[in-house]
Regions:
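Accessory alpha-helical/coil subdomains and C-terminal extensions
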Residues: 122, 130-135, 143-145, 152, ...
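Short glycine/serine/threonine-rich phosphate/pyrophosphate-binding segments
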Residues: 20-30, 51-52, 93, 114-117, ...
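Short, acidic/small-residue loops that bind anionic groups at enzyme active sites
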Residues: 38, 44-45, 147-170, 224-231
Length: 251
């Protein structure tokens, strides 16, 4: 595929950061629509890591870095969780000396290296016209870097925290909410059996959506989120009141 004149535009897809159940369906949806519109689709392995490890030689084996996606390939994977392209937390603008690919070690030998020039060369070598990174703030922040360098990027937010500003929906968030609700419902039996006040902490980084929405759905009595200060004394009073009002004596 490399360096050949092409009649089709090429889309590259990668997944970075943590895994969520909706990644494979997202990859499938993009791939099938793109193929039917006449595009060629390349899936990069292990997020941005696949893009920095490409060897720019026509006879090089780059199968560990990317694969050509087909309808058959994505149809086999889309019913499973996670990402069949694999993922990593690699950020090409912050690559440690030990993580620099072997073929680039003679060129990059600082403690922290910016491999963006190599990424751009690799994209050109592979004939990628558009890149679709799927990930959270760190993955997408590097997508912004490539956009600033003049490359065409379409970012898809993926984070259970729902903390990517300016977006309507984050892949993984809805699953986080339903799983949190299920777990909270299961823990209620233990809280009720022992007549306890149960405190549950959920993931969410610096955003309170993962705690607030399950509470609004009725699975918890009270909720505290990082966006607002709270009084531990007042919270304690409310939880004691909730417990006393509950016939099973828990909150």
């Amino acid at each position: 595929m490399e360096n050949e004149s092409k009649s089709k535009l090429v889309i590259g897809i990668l997944t970075g950061g943590g895994d969520v159940p909706g990644l494979n369906p997202a990859i499938r949806a993009i791939t099938i629509r793109a193929l039917r519109e006449g595009y060629k689709v390349i899936g990069f392995r292990r997020g941005w890591a696949g893009l920095i490890e490409v060897i720019r030689e026509n006879d090089a084996d780059n199968s560990k870095c990317y694969e050509v996606l087909t309808e058959e390939r994505v149809n086999k994977a889309f019913r499973t969780g996670g990402t069949f392209l694999h993922t990593s937390r690699t950020n090409p603008s912050k690559v440690s000396k030990d993580s620099v690919p072997d073929n680039l070690k003679s060129k990059y030998h600082k403690e922290v290296n910016d491999l963006t020039p190599e990424v751009l060369k690799n994209l050109a070598f592979l004939g990628i016209d558009y890149l679709i990174p799927i990930g959270g703030d760190d993955t997408l922040s590097y997508g912004v870097r490539l956009y600033q360098e003049g490359f065409k990027v379409i970012a898809i937010p993926k984070t259970m925290d729902n903390d990517v500003p300016g977006t309507d929906y984050c892949i993984g968030f809805s699953t986080c909410i339903t799983r949190t609700m299920s777990l909270t419902d299961m823990l209620k039996t233990s809280a009720g059996s022992h007549e306890r006040i149960l405190v549950m902490e959920v993931f969410g980084r610096y955003a309170g959506f993962t705690a607030m929405l399950p509470t609004m759905a009725g699975v918890a009595n009270r909720c505290v989120i990082p966006e607002y200060k709270f009084s531990i004394e007042r919270l304690t009073e409310l939880l004691i009141s909730d417990r006393n009002l509950n016939s099973s004596k828990y909150s």
